[in-house]
């Protein structure tokens, strides 16, 4: 049966791929409520985020999505329609407000009966919920596995292959429901990388898929997730992206150099850039990271190639990403606890000593290295061949 499901999904893939590319030609950029607000998020917070995206210059930099994560749901009405809770008195009005700013709005659910925060999920109401999202004017859906894992285990105890088949089918079901609405809605799969999702995510309509467990605002969490993306570059491209989770930049528990590493690595990975901080309370330092035009251009490069690891020696890693104009983005990462010098491996990258170099975080430095890379830090370069 699993083989039959995959065969049918692959037959439909050309159509799905075309629709996916239109929605997500480059990785999504925007904001998500979870990392800062968690289940406390309100209508007021979302409106404030939309205002801040415009006022701060983030909209002009490409941050378009304003995404509500978990905890917006109330119960269902007598007809089975999902109803927002009291924190969100009028979801259509909220969507209209976000759209009036020239932005897009996203929402969250689960294929299970409950979300991770124990709010109402979409289980057995997929078509109904998709229609409601479209009626409200939603442009993005994050679909989080959560309690559907219990459904899988109960239906097929000890049979992991069957459980994964059910997971694929659950995501495919919502994808078809979204397509049936006629509204272009970005479909974000959140299932923590299970069953090598990068191999099957496109066939169930995913525009992006989480490759690991949730990120936390710590260097250990961020770096373990980010550097674990090595080897996944061939699975990403226009319309379908590996997602190492949302940004923690500006949430305050990492150092400046660590946030530079975070932003640099996510850009090389062509990852979705979804800010997760309180946008109404951003420091100048946080803005300088999130609004850096060069790092955003690396992430959003229209070639659509995810970067990958070039070398790893002890705590030192070098990653590169090809760009459409022939340039190469290169990150020199120091995962160690002391500042150390690092150099460009010119020959390994197909470069010469005459290659022109732009230092993204230190534009006044036009040298060819070596560079002193701080503890947990990065030197991010754009190199012209």
Where are the language model's segments positioned?
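Bacterial Sec-dependent N-terminal signal peptides
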Residues: 1-20
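Glycan-recognition surfaces
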Residues: 183-278
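Aromatic-lined carbohydrate-binding/catalytic grooves of carbohydrate-active enzymes
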Residues: 49, 53-159
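N-terminal module-boundary/linker segments of secreted carbohydrate-active enzymes
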Residues: 20-47, 52
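Carbohydrate-binding surface patches
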Residues: 266-269, 274-276, 312-351
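Catalytic cores of secreted or luminal carbohydrate-active enzymes
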Residues: 261-310
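Structural recognition of the beta-strand scaffold that forms the well-ordered cores
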Residues: 27-33, 62-68, 104-109, 139-144, ...
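C-terminal beta-strand-rich structural cap/linker in extracellular carbohydrate-active enzymes
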Residues: 367-385
